[in-house]
């Protein structure tokens, strides 16, 4: 599905309950809204052009700014306000994923080795 945005357009490539993959096109000088996600991580991989990613930390007292060029990647943690600004026309892959617990296992039995 392709959706128009004030900053360009986004095309949803794949999504399920814990992961989304989008191809975005951005227009020079445009920016997305300053926003945050409650549970989702957000990743940006630039394939063409230049994109600034701003992330506000410590309740707005500190703002990190990262300039991404072709082949560069950055991530934004859940709960962090962020925004991107297009330095040039370009394209990027935008990924969203939910954090999961790597120790998410509840054992009812214990595995056994084969007898020797």
Q: Where are the predicted features?
A:
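Glycine- and acidic-residue-biased ligand/ion/polar-headgroup-sensing regions
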Residues: 39-58
């Amino acid at each position: 599905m392709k959706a128009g945005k004030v900053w360009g357009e986004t095309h949803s490539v794949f999504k399920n309950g814990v992961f989304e993959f989008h191809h975005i096109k951005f227009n020079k000088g445009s920016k997305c809204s300053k926003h945050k996600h409650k549970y989702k991580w957000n990743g940006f991989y630039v394939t063409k052009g230049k994109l600034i990613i701003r992330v506000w930390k410590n309740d707005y007292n500190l703002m990190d700014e990262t300039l991404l060029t072709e082949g560069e990647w950055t991530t934004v943690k859940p709960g962090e306000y962020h925004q991107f600004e297009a330095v040039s026309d370009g394209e990027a892959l935008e990924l969203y994923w939910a954090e999961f617990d790597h120790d998410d296992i509840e054992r009812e039995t214990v595995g056994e080795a084969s007898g020797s």
